[in-house]
A protein has these predicted regions:
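Generic beta-sheet signal
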Residues: 5-6, 97-107
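Short active-site segment of divalent metal-dependent hydrolases/proteases
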Residues: 13, 87, 108-109
Length: 156
């Protein structure tokens, strides 16, 4: 049976260059909160099993509306935080339960997707870059990732 994992690039956050505090604490913008709510409404009917997020605030916040809608807690997954080594992020993906939703960063997701492609996963006509609040759906059978699809960010 083919089973999905939903990997979300965090929603829109304020400008990195304008943020003067620790970047881990940079929150979603108003647009980002709207995107997060739209993602929640799209993903909730799919019955996610668990919500896993980079510990960065913008990632945790991206999954908060989904958690509220589903009555689930967003769990931190440090192996998918920004600048995470490929081996660590790949292990997090491989360890994630079926139908999990994960939220990570634009520098991490392409790395493990490329790692899975090298292992034989087909991405078809995937995007050249993952936009904020986009979703990469990774399909696997018995732990072997077979193909992926890309969902554009919600229109806001």
């Amino acid at each position: 049976m083919v089973v999905p994992l939903y990997v979300i690039r965090h929603a829109h956050a304020g400008s990195r260059s304008a943020w003067l505090e620790d970047d881990r604490l940079r929150p979603l913008s108003d647009k980002g909160w709207q995107q997060a709510q739209a993602l929640a409404e799209r993903i909730a009917p799919l019955g996610p099993s668990v919500l896993l997020s980079s510990p960065y605030k913008r990632c945790m916040q991206t999954l908060e509306p989904l958690g509220e809608l589903m009555g689930m807690t967003v769990q931190e997954e440090p192996r998918i935080e920004e600048d995470s080594p490929l081996e660590r992020s790949l292990a997090a993906i491989e360890d994630a339960p079926d139908n999990a939703v994960l939220c990570s960063h634009g520098d991490v997701i392409p790395g493990f997707v490329n790692g899975l492609i090298r292992r034989g996963m087909d991405i078809g006509e995937g995007p050249h870059a993952l936009r904020k609040a986009s979703v990469c759906v990774l399909h696997h059978v018995n732990g072997l990732f077979t193909h992926a699809e890309y969902w554009d960010p919600p229109s806001i």
